Amino acid sequence: MIRKIEKKEIRNRIHRRIRRKLSGTAERPRLAVFRSVAHIYAQVIDDAQGQTLVSASSVDKDGKSKGGNVAAAKAIGKLVAERAKEKGIKSVVFDRGGYQYHGRVKALADAAREAGLEF
Protein backbone atom coordinates (compact mmCIF):
# COMPACT_ATOMS: atom_id res chain seq x y z
CA MET A 1 0.00 0.00 0.00
CA ILE A 2 1.07 3.53 -0.64
CA ARG A 3 1.17 5.44 2.58
CA LYS A 4 0.41 9.11 2.82
CA ILE A 5 3.41 11.14 3.91
CA GLU A 6 2.52 13.53 6.70
CA LYS A 7 3.24 17.26 6.41
CA LYS A 8 5.58 17.17 9.40
CA GLU A 9 7.63 14.36 7.86
CA ILE A 10 7.93 16.27 4.58
CA ARG A 11 9.07 19.40 6.46
CA ASN A 12 11.64 17.34 8.39
CA ARG A 13 13.02 15.89 5.14
CA ILE A 14 13.36 19.39 3.69
CA HIS A 15 15.01 20.61 6.89
CA ARG A 16 17.54 17.76 6.86
CA ARG A 17 18.35 18.54 3.22
CA ILE A 18 18.89 22.22 4.09
CA ARG A 19 21.04 21.38 7.14
CA ARG A 20 23.38 19.24 5.03
CA LYS A 21 24.42 22.39 3.19
CA LEU A 22 24.03 24.92 6.00
CA SER A 23 26.13 25.25 9.15
CA GLY A 24 26.77 28.04 11.62
CA THR A 25 30.24 29.06 12.77
CA ALA A 26 31.46 31.32 15.57
CA GLU A 27 31.93 34.18 13.07
CA ARG A 28 28.63 33.59 11.29
CA PRO A 29 26.20 31.55 13.41
CA ARG A 30 22.92 30.04 12.23
CA LEU A 31 19.58 31.77 12.91
CA ALA A 32 17.20 28.82 13.27
CA VAL A 33 13.42 29.27 13.24
CA PHE A 34 10.83 26.89 14.70
CA ARG A 35 7.16 27.55 14.15
CA SER A 36 4.42 25.86 16.16
CA VAL A 37 0.69 26.43 15.92
CA ALA A 38 0.65 28.74 18.95
CA HIS A 39 4.17 30.22 19.09
CA ILE A 40 7.33 31.03 17.16
CA TYR A 41 10.91 30.45 18.32
CA ALA A 42 14.27 31.76 17.05
CA GLN A 43 17.78 30.72 18.08
CA VAL A 44 21.23 31.87 17.04
CA ILE A 45 23.38 28.73 17.10
CA ASP A 46 27.13 28.11 16.79
CA ASP A 47 27.18 24.61 15.25
CA ALA A 48 30.95 24.21 15.68
CA GLN A 49 30.59 24.42 19.47
CA GLY A 50 27.04 23.05 19.57
CA GLN A 51 25.85 26.03 21.60
CA THR A 52 22.86 28.32 21.47
CA LEU A 53 24.26 31.84 21.68
CA VAL A 54 20.98 33.80 21.69
CA SER A 55 17.33 32.83 21.74
CA ALA A 56 13.92 34.50 21.72
CA SER A 57 10.39 33.20 21.51
CA SER A 58 6.80 34.29 21.87
CA VAL A 59 6.72 32.24 25.10
CA ASP A 60 9.37 34.49 26.72
CA LYS A 61 8.23 37.12 29.17
CA ASP A 62 9.39 39.75 26.64
CA GLY A 63 7.20 38.31 23.88
CA LYS A 64 4.49 36.50 25.82
CA SER A 65 1.56 38.81 25.10
CA LYS A 66 2.09 38.63 21.35
CA GLY A 67 0.94 35.05 20.62
CA GLY A 68 2.12 33.21 17.51
CA ASN A 69 0.91 35.41 14.67
CA VAL A 70 2.76 37.61 12.16
CA ALA A 71 2.96 40.53 14.60
CA ALA A 72 4.56 38.23 17.17
CA ALA A 73 7.04 36.98 14.56
CA LYS A 74 8.07 40.57 13.82
CA ALA A 75 8.55 41.27 17.53
CA ILE A 76 10.60 38.09 18.00
CA GLY A 77 12.75 38.88 14.95
CA LYS A 78 13.53 42.32 16.33
CA LEU A 79 14.19 40.89 19.82
CA VAL A 80 16.57 38.15 18.62
CA ALA A 81 18.47 40.69 16.49
CA GLU A 82 18.87 43.06 19.44
CA ARG A 83 20.08 40.23 21.69
CA ALA A 84 22.52 39.07 18.99
CA LYS A 85 23.91 42.58 18.56
CA GLU A 86 24.45 42.79 22.35
CA LYS A 87 26.61 39.63 22.07
CA GLY A 88 28.55 41.13 19.15
CA ILE A 89 26.92 39.05 16.39
CA LYS A 90 26.38 41.08 13.22
CA SER A 91 26.02 38.44 10.51
CA VAL A 92 24.12 35.13 10.52
CA VAL A 93 23.07 32.32 8.19
CA PHE A 94 19.27 32.01 8.01
CA ASP A 95 17.80 28.52 8.57
CA ARG A 96 14.09 28.52 7.76
CA GLY A 97 13.70 25.09 9.32
CA GLY A 98 12.03 23.48 6.32
CA TYR A 99 9.15 25.97 6.39
CA GLN A 100 8.19 28.06 3.38
CA TYR A 101 9.74 31.52 3.36
CA HIS A 102 6.33 33.13 3.77
CA GLY A 103 4.11 34.54 6.48
CA ARG A 104 5.52 34.26 10.00
CA VAL A 105 8.95 33.01 8.89
CA LYS A 106 9.35 35.88 6.41
CA ALA A 107 8.11 38.42 8.98
CA LEU A 108 10.69 37.22 11.51
CA ALA A 109 13.50 37.38 8.93
CA ASP A 110 12.52 40.86 7.71
CA ALA A 111 12.29 42.22 11.27
CA ALA A 112 15.72 40.77 12.12
CA ARG A 113 17.20 42.41 9.01
CA GLU A 114 15.59 45.76 9.86
CA ALA A 115 17.01 45.52 13.40
CA GLY A 116 20.53 45.19 11.99
CA LEU A 117 21.34 41.51 11.42
CA GLU A 118 22.92 40.70 8.05
CA PHE A 119 22.01 37.55 6.12
Swiss-Prot record:
Pfam families: Ribosomal_L18p (PF00861). One of its GO terms (cellular component) is cytosolic large ribosomal subunit. Keywords: Ribonucleoprotein, Ribosomal protein, RNA-binding, rRNA-binding. The keyword Ribosomal protein applies. InterPro entries: Ribosomal_uL18_bac-type, Ribosomal_uL18_bac/euk. CDD domains: Ribosomal_L18_L5e. Coiled coil: none annotated. GO terms for molecular function: 5S rRNA binding; structural constituent of ribosome. GO terms for biological process: translation. Part of the 50S ribosomal subunit; part of the 5S rRNA/L5/L18/L25 subcomplex. Contacts the 5S and 23S rRNAs. Belongs to the universal ribosomal protein uL18 family. PANTHER family: 39S RIBOSOMAL PROTEIN L18, MITOCHONDRIAL, LARGE RIBOSOMAL SUBUNIT PROTEIN UL18M. This is one of the proteins that bind and probably mediate the attachment of the 5S RNA into the large ribosomal subunit, where it forms part of the central protuberance. This is Large ribosomal subunit protein uL18. It comes from Solibacter usitatus (strain Ellin6076).
